[in-house]
Amino acid sequence: MPVPGFAESKLDLPQNPNFVSGTANFNINGNTLTIEQNTEKLIANWSSFNIGKENKVEFKQPNLTSTALNRVNSNDPTHIYGSLKSNGKIILINPNGVLFQEGSRVDVGSIIASTLNLKDKDFINDKYAFETEGLSREINNQGDIQAIEGGTVAIIASQIENKGKIETPNGAVALISGEKVKLSLNGNSLIQYSIERGVLNALIDNKQALKVDNGTIILSAKGVKEVKNAVIKNSGSLRADGITKKGGKIYLSASNGKVLNSGVIAANSQQNQGGSIRVTAENIQIDENSKISTVGKKSGGLIEIGGSWQNSNKEVFQATNTTIAEGTILDASAFDMGDGGEIVVWSDIHNSNSKTTVKGTLKAEGGKIKGNGGRIETSGRALDIDEITISTKSTDGVDGQWLIDPYNITISSGSDTNISGSFSASDNDAVINVGTLESALASSNVNVTTAGGGSQNGDITVDASITSSSSNDLTLDADRHIYINQNICSMGSYQNSLK
């Protein structure tokens, strides 16, 4: 039923609530609207839901898991300039858009803001199935959004832009772009999600800060299958650092589109093991000055860009093109104690159009006090590792491994081309610059492998002299023949292995 007594200005406070399910008491005192929710669940339809700059809306709910579904029936977007508070969970739906303006403040148990609708029946039965009923608009955040520890901030729309700050310690922040989206929640905690149907011009653009200490960050966009136009951009910071625990988890997923990163992605840990970062898309561009890290005090974490180690995890979508630009730093090292972590930069080696380009710095070093080096893989059907810098060194332990894995490989004084994996040929003739190889041997064990592919037989040819003074091992593992046309000289204690 409608509730009388609301202010005339629809820009100051929400207007004309109509109860669909549950009960609540409404009180307006000056510039503040207080909603005292009496039932575990509340459904209210509003003619508008705006909060003016000096205005406040507060939901007082029975407990942390109590939920209020607020649906806006208006042709205009929702504008939040002021303050929105709750001690429980708020769902705010407006198909014409939601704008959290600069200076706005949201303090809640959890919040889901969506331009996709949620049916009343599904909400009552704890089914969070969001779906568009026509064209949906964007959600833009320029303010501060904060949920309680262990809470969830989920934003669901066709296009999402964040120019503000979103934070929930030990919880989850999820920005999801699609036309049909399902969430699974346990109380305030996000358990899992799925995008059942993509949307045209899917876009997620983070220009500021998402922070979830010990938690999970998800940026996931799915476009229309035939168009493959989903885009995820990060020029800000995504941080899931572990303050007292293991580092958190960060996922960027645009399976039929592209991911562009020029910012910071970090799941480090000050006291424990580094966390995990996974970036998957058809095309991945990690631009210069990007910093991606899962550094841990006790051991390094996991960084997967474009795929998993030797495609061992079939659930990880394989990229077609993956580029790590010069100036980029990927770091999965241990800080004090423990082993270095794992870094994979991958594109689908079975796709004739795939290419991996790596020109940045990749580190999976052991702890400064004690610990072994980690492992790094760079793979792709065509591989360009010219100007790459690799380190899996250990101060007090065993140096780690760099895996390159293409098709035919020639080790020469020429530039690195068509290289993938420990050092493996990825497409027709692949070339590894001897300087790149020698530099890597100073801090890592190096495996050069071929599987045979393209129009080649899987041979390894050494056409330049290789000299190393380190104790690390060089392994040449060919699918067919190994041709040694120049000297391989060790002034250290390392072993050469020819297979």
Locate each region found by the language model.
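Extracellular and secretory-pathway beta-repeat/beta-biased strand scaffolds
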Residues: M1-K499
